[in-house]
C-alpha cells in the first residue's frame, strides 16, 4: 500500500452552494444536506487508512464537541474505493468506534459526491455557512505532516469567525493528505 501525498484543489469557490447528496451512514440511515440545520456545516472527506486522517481525526472529534449541533455539524464522507485495503462500510464502522466519532460518517461508494465537491485528498474539508454557501475549503490546522503538532487550529478559528458573523481572511488554504482512492474504469 502506497501513500500519495496530495494537496486539495479548488473546484468549489467561495459562495458556491453545497452540492446535494443522499448517502448512507454507518448507522444505516440515509442523510442529505437538508438534514443538517446547524449554522455551520463542515463536510470532510476522510477515510480509514490514511495517516493524515488518523492524525487529525481527534481534532475533528474535539471540534464537534466544542460546539453545539445547532452551531456546527461535522459530516465525514468516505469516497475511497470500498475495495481498497482497510476501506469499505464495515471498516468505516470499526474506524468510527475506534476513534469515538461524534458525527455522521457516510459512504460515497459511487464517488460522485467527491467529484461534485472537487475533493481529491483525505482529509479534504469544506466549511459552509447557514445558507450552505461555501466560506472555506482547506486545512483543519497548520500541521503539514501527520507527526507534527498543530500550532494554529485553522478550522476552529474559521468556525468561530463564521458564527460571529465575520468574513474570513482566506477562503482557500489547501489541505494535505492521501489521495482519494478512485475506482478504476472497467
Language model segments and positions:
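Chalcogenol-based redox active-site neighborhoods
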Residues: 1-163, 167-172, 179-186
Amino acid at each position: 500500500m502506497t501513500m500519495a501525498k496530495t494537496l486539495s484543489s479548488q473546484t468549489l469557490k467561495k459562495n458556491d452552494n453545497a452540492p446535494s447528496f443522499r448517502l448512507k451512514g454507518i448507522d444505516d440511515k440515509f442523510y442529505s444536506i437538508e438534514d443538517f440545520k446547524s449554522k455551520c456545516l463542515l463536510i470532510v472527506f476522510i477515510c480509514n487508512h490514511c495517516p493524515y486522517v488518523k492524525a487529525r481525526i481527534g481534532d475533528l472529534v474535539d471540534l464537534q464537541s466544542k460546539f453545539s449541533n445547532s452551531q456546527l455539524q461535522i459530516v465525514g464522507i468516505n469516497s475511497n474505493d470500498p475495495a481498497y485495503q482497510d476501506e469499505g462500510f464495515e471498516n468505516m464502522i470499526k474506524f468510527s468506534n475506534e476513534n469515538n466519532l461524534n458525527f455522521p460518517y457516510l459512504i460515497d461508494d459511487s464517488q460522485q459526491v467527491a467529484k461534485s465537491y472537487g475533493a481529491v485528498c483525505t482529509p479534504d474539508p469544506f466549511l459552509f455557512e447557514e445558507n450552505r454557501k461555501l466560506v472555506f475549503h482547506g486545512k483543519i490546522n497548520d500541521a503539514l505532516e501527520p507527526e507534527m503538532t498543530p500550532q494554529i487550529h485553522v478550522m476552529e478559528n474559521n468556525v468561530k469567525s463564521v458564527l460571529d458573523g465575520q468574513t474570513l481572511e482566506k477562503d482557500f488554504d489547501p489541505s494535505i493528505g492521501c489521495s482519494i482512492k478512485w475506482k478504476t474504469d472497467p
